Design a protein with these regions (language model features):
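Bacterial Sec-dependent N-terminal signal peptides
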Residues: 1-22
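Carbohydrate-active catalytic/glycan-binding domains of CAZyme proteins
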Residues: 20-216
């Protein structure tokens, strides 16, 4: 009986698209990597999505949920998939969405067909929940496995930066269009003074305690 009631409630939530106050706030999907964005007084939370029958990181798409009172949430469903990028082959991992000049930019890490390594793409939409499209037709950055976990910071002077990486920390200056960058990719030294000393046995290749983005 208990399982029947839970199934009915879960079906109701999926049909209605609304999620009431609860912890965890999302109970109808396996979600992870929440990335918040506030726009016009409403909070949007972008998540990754694990497939129900997976025992590993089987993540094919991204979802978004929103609220204006932190109690009642709206499920906007799947808004983007790695299949929307011709150059991507799998792994729709932790993403970030930002708004600028009336456009919404999703920075998304995936596994690239072109070099069989990690890469970060960007998708553009006219609303917080899309529809989004790939304006470049190629990765924004790609070099190694650790090109994951992107996040974007817009400074007070208007300059936008994208930070990413695990276990390395990198950043670039984004151009005004938010889909290209200027200058070189800069790697930030992962010193113990800045990021803490790793617990347990020392690891010269990964010395710091905190090594995973998003960083800001």
């Amino acid at each position: 009986m208990k399982n029947t009631i839970q199934s009915i409630l879960g079906l109701f939530l999926m049909i209605s698209g609304a999620v009431s106050a609860q912890n965890p706030i999302i109970q109808t999907n396996y979600t992870a990597d929440p990335a918040p964005m506030v726009y016009n007084g409403r909070l949007y939370v972008y998540t990754t999505h694990d497939e129900d029958d997976s025992t590993w990181f089987t993540m094919n798409d991204w979802k978004v949920y929103s609220t204006n009172d932190m109690v009642n949430w709206t499920d906007h469903g799947t808004i983007l998939s790695y299949n929307d990028f011709e150059w991507a082959k799998r792994d729709a991992w932790a993403a970030q969405c930002v708004e600028r000049n009336g456009k919404f930019f999703m920075y998304v890490p995936m596994w690239s067909k072109t070099n069989n390594k990690g890469a970060i793409g960007v998708a553009v939409g006219d609303s917080p929940f899309g529809p989004f499209h790939d304006p470049l037709g190629k990765p924004l950055v790609q070099s190694e496995w650790g090109d994951i976990d992107p996040t974007v910071f817009i400074d007070d002077d208007g300059q936008a930066y994208m930070y990413w990486g695990n276990p390395k920390l990198k950043y670039v200056k984004l151009n005004e269009d938010m889909i290209s960058y200027s200058g070189n990719i800069i790697e930030v030294p992962m010193t113990e003074e800045s990021f803490g000393k790793r617990d347990g046995k020392p690891n010269p290749e990964r010395p710091s305690k905190h090594e995973e983005g998003p960083w800001l």
